[in-house]
Design a protein with these regions (language model features):
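N-terminal hydrophobic/helix-forming segments and targeting peptides
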Residues: 1-456
């Protein structure tokens, strides 16, 4: 089903399945606006399907369902296959971090009767898109006594929202002469928290009132910002988009749409696979996949090591064989073709909404710099599988040559000598506070990922 519009094949029964699946996805997306929430919600979904931590198993056998969590920001789950791990795994890997605005460690200040939060944006954003929209605050505050306070402000209907102001058009003559990259600077992305002074305070009374509210509601003080991790994200739930309800608008489709569909493909398995099936959800992709929770961390290989150790006698050669024989889909989104900005695409090699799961044989920029370039033999295997399963799919590049580019986690796992190719959902308005995906593509990704887990 190559380059066909998926909507055309759905009968009424299948259309209901498409819409129902997307309702569950919308719930996950709305509830998973940070990496920590994405992981905790993944754990809930997995446990509801019978997955358990490794400690719950004395010795794993085919069909067992096991999961790992790393530092509350990575999630890995496995369905043990009938073949030994050294024969390789079938892995779906996505990232659960999204572009956002982070709160600095010493952030709270008052200026001219406004209480403001100083911030530092995370990932590649068009900064001007983040002003004058309702924003929410999510994260954790870790106190010296070891307690951890969960913060969520802005999505409960009874909550206030916060935001970042912009200059009125009437006084914007100088601002309008700036380039889009400079019209809002990084240091301008400070969040307004309040304007009401605390009675009896003479200095920084508005800031004092905000601190009073935080103390009463969350029991933390200004000094606790030093050990806090607070993220500013768009407020509000994901929504149906378009009069025909054919699309989903929401924050964080990149890459939680692939994270959710990959997760569901594994946890919904109701049979013992030939090869162990795996879903791995990683952090820090938007800033280079670095650190203990990024794809470059050793944690993923460590989990395979733990499985080998549980099921047999561990050795380095067993781990290397398992990795080398593994086949993986780097489940990441692709740039959707937008007719309003058609000039950035090669139309023959673009990702179209509604045409199904999108493969990127290679990513990178300019002369394929930083690319993972998948083996054509591997792509041929996948083509044959998806055609036999009736899954709609397409291939694309990330725009015209020299127009720009981007990368994924694919090359990192490719460095382990796995077979890896990027496969995900086409997204409009990528990295904006509101991104758009087709419900058909979400469903076809789920079906494609399920089929991949059976690849011989």
């Amino acid at each position: 089903m190559y380059r066909k519009n998926a909507w055309e094949k759905y009968d009424e029964e299948t259309l209901e399945l498409v819409m129902s699946f997307n309702e569950s996805y919308k719930q996950y997306l709305s509830a998973s606006k940070t990496e920590r929430l994405a992981v905790s919600n993944a754990v809930k979904l997995a446990e509801a399907k019978g997955f358990k931590p490794l400690e719950a198993y004395e010795k794993l056998v085919p069909g067992d369902k096991v999961y790992f969590v790393n530092k509350k920001k990575n999630f890995v789950c496995y369905v043990i296959g009938s073949e030994p791990l050294e024969a390789g795994l079938r892995v779906l890997g996505a990232h659960i971090d999204s572009p956002r605005i982070d709160v600095k460690q010493d952030p709270l200040y008052e200026r001219d009767n406004f209480a403001l939060l100083d911030t530092h944006y995370y990932g590649g954003i068009k900064k001007y898109q983040w002003v004058t929209i309702p924003l929410a605050i999510y994260g954790v505050v870790c106190k010296k006594d070891g307690s951890v306070i969960d913060v969520a402000i802005g999505d409960d209907p009874t909550d206030p929202v916060v935001g970042i102001s912009d200059l009125l058009i009437h006084l914007s003559a100088d601002q309008m002469q700036k380039s889009a990259a400079k019209v809002i600077e990084g240091e301008d992305l400070d969040v307004t928290l309040g304007s009401m002074p605390l009675k009896g305070e003479e200095k920084n009374a508005v800031k004092a009132n905000v601190l009073r509210i935080l103390k009463e509601k969350y029991d933390f003080e200004e000094a606790d910002f030093v050990s806090a991790e607070l993220e500013i994200v768009p407020a509000g739930p994901s929504r149906d988009y378009g009069l025909d309800r054919s699309m989903v608008a929401g924050y964080g489709h990149d890459d939680r749409v692939c994270a959710y569909t990959s997760l569901r493909a594994v946890i919904d398995m109701d049979f013992v696979p030939t090869y162990t099936a795996c879903c791995v959800l990683v952090d820090k992709e938007e800033v280079g996949s670095i650190g203990a929770t990024g794809a470059q961390s050793k944690f993923f290989a460590d989990t395979i090591m733990y499985l080998i150790d549980n099921m047999s006698t561990y050795s380095e050669i067993k781990l290397r064989k398992a990795l080398t024989n593994t086949k993986m889909l780097s489940s990441d989104v692709s740039a959707g073709y937008d007719p309003l900005f058609a000039y950035v695409n090669d139309s023959k090699n673009a990702a179209y909404l509604g045409h199904g799961l999108c493969f990127n044989k290679y990513t990178g920029s300019r002369g394929k710099s930083g690319a993972n370039d998948a083996m054509p033999e591997y792509m041929a295997e996948i083509r044959n599988l998806l055609d036999s399963c009736g899954v709609n799919y397409q291939t694309a590049e990330l725009g015209k040559v020299d127009q720009g580019g981007g990368g994924t986690i694919a090359y990192i796992l490719g460095n382990e000598n796995m077979y890896v190719i990027d496969a995900g959902v086409a997204v409009l308005c990528m990295h904006a506070p509101m991104e758009i995906v087709s419900k058909a593509d979400v469903y076809e990704a789920y079906q494609g990922y399920k089929a991949f887990l059976t690849l011989e």
